[in-house]
Amino acid sequence: MTPAHKVLLCILDGWGIRQERDNNAIVLAGTPHLDKLASPYPFTELQTAGLAVGLPEGQMGNSEVGHTNIGAGRIVYQDLVRINRAAESGELAQNPVLRAALDGVKADGKALHLLGLVSPGGVHSSMDHLFALLKAAKERNVAHVYVHAFLDGRDTPPQSALGYVEELERFLHETHTGRIATVTGRFYAMDRDKRWDRVHQAYEALVFGRGPKAPDALSAIRASYAEKVTDEFVKPTVLAAGDGTPVGRIQDGDAVIFFNFRADRARELTQALAFPEFKEFDRGGLRLGRYVCMTQYDETFKLPALFEPDQPQDIFPELLSRQGLRQFRTAETEKYAHVTFFFNGGREVVYAGEDRHLVPSPRDVKTYDLKPEMSAYEVTAELVKRLDSGKYDFALVNFANPDMVGHSGRLDAAMKAVKAVDECLGALGKACERNGWVLAISADHGNCEQMVDLETGEPHTAHTLNPVPFHLIHPDFRGQKLRPGILADIAPTLCKVMGLPQSKEMNRQGLLP
């Protein structure tokens, strides 16, 4: 079929709406290109957090959740909600995969290691899930249980780990369910950009007990703060007795459960610990007894998971493919999974008629505040070429800058990131105009519109609960009104714009009247 309109959907990652100017990188930077493009055309606000995207009430959204909802055209209830319900009801403790792992490690007389992000952020993990796993291990009489605590500082304030780790230590002491064995910033343990040198340092601490030593977790964190190293960047630290013996390193035959429910930042460490073949660094011949993921981290990983994927059917990209339309996806490395895997409903699939292009994120800087433009200009150049080719009917692009630089807490850098993305929008607006495309601009969640925590005065490095914009830019829609909505309204809206039949499973009415 021939669509009524061809559409470019731009997702400005971490670009929320907040009216106040103070510490608002978007307002302070100014967006002259976006303002010029969007001013004559319809605009509305979309909710991106809590129940609106299938998360618990008051829980901030994230890129994984956002892109899944955008592609599905309905509210997709997230793993966090599913696992919360299982933990609260006792269903988790009866999970057959969990019981097999616990009974196996007990029978073997080996240790159980629980790895994951100790954080209330709710983006990658939940402390309630960790507590439920610890209780289950005690109920199954597992004798040796160790927690390897990864510290946040991105989805939480940058120096907030002491409170969360103290809560964990209190729980462990009161319930006699285990001990903390290592403390590591997520910068090392949760890389997703193939920076294997970081993962290697985490592995060395987990498996060999190598790295800085500390008598307990709180001392390790305080020592890092004294060196002006915040939670995210705490070096992999081994908790050890007075003679230097590690509290609990991962050894041959042990069992590991990675309790992060979000996949993208759990994959690399999982590969290092559990894959039979691995060539990125010398692992020293570790052979685990069991390795269990909280969720399915990748369809190609032949590893058991406590919760299998709940994948939405008849989603927007699938609809495009069935109609014989050509689609193009692009982003830089940091957000490439979001415009592919997550937009495709959590599937490792390339639909018929779907082309992709990955632009590498910068690797010459440690953090992106040092290069706020990241790879936005390269992404834009490739996308303009594809729009001008006349080959496609739909295109999706994600600009990572507002989110990735926003996570640094550096207002000046975030403003530069905003300016770079605004320039790119100007170029894309011109390309859409000369090719007759509709330009739809939105975001998956907020971030850089609030760079300082209003309560503490510290840098704000997490996502926000703020709504995000939705612009529909094309002369055919001048003067039309858009309803306020949620991210799941985007796909039904694009179906109407393109003249496509909306699937029954897309149960949202969209934003157009």
Swiss-Prot record:
The organism named in the record is Myxococcus xanthus (strain DK1622)
What NCBIfam families has UniProt attached to this entry? pgm_bpd_ind
PANTHER family (UniProt xref)? 2,3-BISPHOSPHOGLYCERATE-INDEPENDENT PHOSPHOGLYCERATE MUTASE
Summarize subunit and interaction data from the UniProt record for this chain.
Monomer.
Can you name this protein? 2,3-bisphosphoglycerate-independent phosphoglycerate mutase
Entry binding sites for substrate: 124, 154-155, 186, 192, 262-265, 335
The coenzyme or cofactor needed here is: Mn(2+)
Record-listed Mn(2+) 2 binding positions: 13, 63, 444-445
- The EC number of this protein is 5.4.2.12
Quote the record's binding site residues for Mn(2+) 1: 403, 407, 463
| Family that this chain belongs to | Belongs to the BPG-independent phosphoglycerate mutase family.
**Catalytic residue list:** 63 (phosphoserine intermediate)
Catalytic reaction equation(s): (2R)-2-phosphoglycerate = (2R)-3-phosphoglycerate
**HAMAP family on file:** GpmI (MF_01038)
Physiological role:
Catalyzes the interconversion of 2-phosphoglycerate and 3-phosphoglycerate.
**Highest taxon listed in the record's lineage:** Bacteria
How and how many cofactors are bound, per the record note? Binds 2 manganese ions per subunit.
Matching CDD domains: iPGM
Q: Which GO terms describe its biological process?
A: glucose catabolic process; glycolytic process
Q: Which keywords describe this protein according to UniProt? A: Glycolysis, Isomerase, Manganese, Metal-binding
Chain's gene name: gpmI
Gene Ontology molecular-function annotations: manganese ion binding; phosphoglycerate mutase activity
Pathway assigned to this chain's UniProt record:
Carbohydrate degradation; glycolysis; pyruvate from D-glyceraldehyde 3-phosphate: step 3/5
Any one GO cellular component localisation term in the record: cytoplasm
